[in-house]
């Protein structure tokens, strides 16, 4: 048996044995293995590159010194004699070209890439081969159909190639009658077109070659056209109504997701004892507006003020009716007249409820804290050395334990009074900003009284929600939530102290501001507790 060196040629010799097409384009010919028998090199089968391009593999070039013997000292055998070459060149004795396989299921089937004549049947010299070599030489044992392509998306399983899809309909550019058959059959008795530059061979890139210049095609876009197309497809600038809808969606999401549930532990973490860590079991992620309940409510308040500013700017730009014309539908055929004003009032009432819950938790925590602190001082006096006789702590003595984050010893840590005052002032200022954006700025009285009152009434009539139906709706919503338009009672009895805050406003504005009045009364009660009691 011949050795491996005698069986396979080197890379240099394989290039000399390449087919005409691979030799001309300087490609590595993917022909089958080569058998050396008696100094004759026998190629097995055509080149796979030619088969993929549906081109007959041709080897009609005269290669000098291509066939070398396996043993040193043998002379190269000529490929064929001159007489055989003359017989092969004659048209009468030329062998028929091999039949083309109907492999029209891949975009590499591009006709017209044949440059030379077909391979003659007398190109091979007589030689002797074994039975095993004859089986390898039988072309019927090899399948060069489309099933040899591997579908990469199916984990390497052999599958049939995807058929060629029909070209898209471009309207007036290509009519149905102009869509021709793409079967790669060259015209009869016409030489196929030649491609001098191999880079133009579209079969190597998996795309379809142009069939005819008469068919209209879509021109490729330049960089300038692509840039202009991208800019034209960009989203148009949003108007006041779109901005208003976006803000409303954000505020509703914050109220229903972040501020729907507020527990005393949340207020404790945010205001009462921030230096002692978290006393609640709620897990918090990240920093920023959503860190504590106070941060979240301030963030929502800023969004509501921005929304009211957008509406005020839209109403100011429109002359005539003082109603909510700026956020109305610009075109009834494309915009639905949604109750945006009612949604804004709903956000306002919901935000007032959040502030009321926070202020109520602070007020109740300060009221409960003082008795527990006094009990803790008395307990320390009982257990101190040298103190007067008194009851000793035992099983029957209830240890004073706070309802808001008590420590292990049963006592209460010192309150962060400065932090409570600062956060309370910030929330109060935010409420005043919302009230001013919704109902207009408040004007102080003049020296004579009448002039200042007239100025206030005029400003009250210019507010964006100054329509009587809107004010009546807001007053009804506040009453439904439990706010009272009169002087508050109970823990808020001392509220504003007098009724001067409403002087200068129209009578209808009194019911609209009863939620703000209630919160201001509760805020003053918290200030009184912080001022009169010693929390330390």
Swiss-Prot record:
Organism name: Chaetomium globosum (strain ATCC 6205 / CBS 148.51 / DSM 1962 / NBRC 6347 / NRRL 1970) (Soil fungus)
Protein location: Nucleus
Domain of life: Eukaryota
GO cellular component: nucleus
UniProt DNA-binding region: 19-57
Keyword Nucleotidyltransferase listed: no
One GO molecular-function entry: zinc ion binding
Statement: the UniProt record of this protein carries the keyword Metal-binding: yes
Description of what induces expression: Expression is regulated by the developmental and secondary metabolism regulators laeA and veA.
Protein name as it appears in the record: Transcription factor cheR
Disruption phenotype: Drastically reduces the transcription of chaetoglobosin A biosynthetic genes and completely abolishes chaetoglobosin A production. Abolishes sporuration.
């Amino acid at each position: 048996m011949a050795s491996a060196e005698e069986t396979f040629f080197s890379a240099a010799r394989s290039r000399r044995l390449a087919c005409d097409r691979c030799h001309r384009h300087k490609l590595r010919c993917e022909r089958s293995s080569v058998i050396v028998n008696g100094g004759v090199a026998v190629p097995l089968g055509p080149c796979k590159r030619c088969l993929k391009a549906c081109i007959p593999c041709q080897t009609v070039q005269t290669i000098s010194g291509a066939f070398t013997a396996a043993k040193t000292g043998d002379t190269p055998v000529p490929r064929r004699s001159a007489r055989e070459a003359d017989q092969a060149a004659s048209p009468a004795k030329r062998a028929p070209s091999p039949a083309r396989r109907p492999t029209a299921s891949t975009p590499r089937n591009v006709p017209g890439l044949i440059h030379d004549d077909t391979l003659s049947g007398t190109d091979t010299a007589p030689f002797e081969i074994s039975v095993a070599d004859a089986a390898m030489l039988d072309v019927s044992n090899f399948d060069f159909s489309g099933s040899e392509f591997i579908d990469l998306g199916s984990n390497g399983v052999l599958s049939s190639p995807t058929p060629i899809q029909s070209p898209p309909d471009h309207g007036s550019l290509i009519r149905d009658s102009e869509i021709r058959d793409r079967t790669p059959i060259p015209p009869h008795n016409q030489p196929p077109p030649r491609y001098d530059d191999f880079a133009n061979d579209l079969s190597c890139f998996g795309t379809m070659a142009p069939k005819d210049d008469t068919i209209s095609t879509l021109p490729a876009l330049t960089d300038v056209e692509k840039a202009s197309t991208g800019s034209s497809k960009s989203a148009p600038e949003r108007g006041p109504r779109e901005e208003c809808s976006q803000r409303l969606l954000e505020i509703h999401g914050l109220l229903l997701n972040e501020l729907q549930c507020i527990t005393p532990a949340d207020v404790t973490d945010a205001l009462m004892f921030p230096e002692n860590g978290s006393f609640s079991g709620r897990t918090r992620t990240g920093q920023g507006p959503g860190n504590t309940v106070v941060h979240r409510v301030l963030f929502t308040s800023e969004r509501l003020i921005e929304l009211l500013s957008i509406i005020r700017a839209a109403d100011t730009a429109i002359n005539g009716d003082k109603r909510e014309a700026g956020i109305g539908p610009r075109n009834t055929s494309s915009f639905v007249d949604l109750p945006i004003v009612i949604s804004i009032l709903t956000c306002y009432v919901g935000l007032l409820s959040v502030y009321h819950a926070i202020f109520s938790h602070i007020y109740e925590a300060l009221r409960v804290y003082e008795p527990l602190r006094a009990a803790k001082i008395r307990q320390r006096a009982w257990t101190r050395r040298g103190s007067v006789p008194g009851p000793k702590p035992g099983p029957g003595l209830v240890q004073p334990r706070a309802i808001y984050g008590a420590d292990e010893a049963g006592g209460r840590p010192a309150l962060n009074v400065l932090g409570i005052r600062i956060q309370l002032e910030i929330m109060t200022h935010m409420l005043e900003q919302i009230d001013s954006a919704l109902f207009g700025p408040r004007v102080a009285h003049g020296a004579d009284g009448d002039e200042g009152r007239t100025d206030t009434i005029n400003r009250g009539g210019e507010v964006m929600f100054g329509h009587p139906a809107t004010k009546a709706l807001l007053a009804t919503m506040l009453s439904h939530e439990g706010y009272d338009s009169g002087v508050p009672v109970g823990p808020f009895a001392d509220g504003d102290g007098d009724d001067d805050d409403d002087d200068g406003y129209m009578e209808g504005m009194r019911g609209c501001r009863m939620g703000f009045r209630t919160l201001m009364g509760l805020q003053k009660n918290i200030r009184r507790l912080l001022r009169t009691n010693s929390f330390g």
